[in-house]
Amino acid sequence: MTSPDLHATRQAILSQQTSPGEQAERCLGLARSPVCAHVFTQLTPDSLTQTAQTPGIEQRPLAGLSVSIKDLFDVQGQVTAAGSVVLADAPPAARDCPAVARLRAAGAGLIGRTNMVEFAFSGVGNNPHHGTPSAWDGRHDRPLGQPGGHVPGGSSSGAAVSVATGAAFIGLGSDTGGSIRVPAALNGIVGFKNTARNTPAQGVLPLSPSLDTVCAMTRSVRDAIVAHEILSGTRVPAAHRPLNHYRLGVCKRYFQEGMDSAAARAFERTLRTLSAAGAHITEIDLPALDELAGLNATGGFSPAESYAWHRELLGREGPRYDPRVAARIQRGAAMKACEYMDLLRGRADWIRRMEQALTGLDAVLSPTVPITAPSRDSVAPGAERDEAFFRANALLLRNPS
């Protein structure tokens, strides 16, 4: 049986079927159990319990319920280490970042900091410093796949598993090229990437400021709406049109290439469900997708912008970085200023042409990832597995990025 979502749990609190204190105890029990091995880099039980015991907390939108924080966000009094040992001795944050402050104001009980890919630079979910969480099937409340475990996706790996297991109702994370959507897909939960800069990114350690987005994972779409409204400070208007008034596009080019049979079956099942509910689904062709490889031939935004932030730290502490992460950051050193400017112009032109191509459509449907989660052993740290790791990383990040 899957864990109840935030909406259902808050309703149960308001009807006195449970209490914030009982829920805090339950979530802490899960967070300390084997199902959450390597999920948290720091637990804050006192913070969660104190929030749950605050008079009137049940009247706030989050009712004192458990929220996990990716180790990329400033929380007052805590070190923002970004899943790395390099920043372990950095001074604690002087204040909450805006995203955390908004969650607290809405009644969030902070259960702890979640593990992540070092410096958020991979979609697989590995962390050689703190261990790699094992993916959890949030739809059926059980471990995903065979003994030994599967990768949870990244970079918001711990955040996803904290939500899927029920240790948290919301997992605060970030998404640059898939870091919310990939782990949400692999753990059977909901991941919503909003518009970049919709939520302030101050106090969030950057990967690529041009693309970084503050967002969250939840166990239901209705919870995702609540989380988005809190983080963005805006209301989501209700849609009053029936589904048969929406035109949805499906593009086989690019998005479905190299898709394994399990992902293909799941995607086809989704299309059948939407069609049966009245949605108009049209196959479309988007030849501009074939230009992406050329557009990013010099490395793309993430290596260049991350290198700008890391270059001095990498020079001093390079051997202490995850070698796979260091290699991707180091690639940014080779990008010339003219190439970066070409990339900015090329991206703007590509977006303009893509918007024109999508005229008349309400949405484009695609599988979030074209493959199921690889086993942890197959992509574990080690040069002998680098080829398998980078192949999996490229496939997992291809569609969302």
Regions found by a protein language model. Give the residues of each.
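Gly/Ser-rich, acidic/histidine-flanked active-site/gating loops
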Residues: 213, 230-297, 303, 333-334
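Short, well-ordered alpha-helical
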Residues: 1-92, 117-122, 267
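Glycine-rich, small-residue loops and helix-cap segments
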Residues: 27, 64, 105, 109, ...
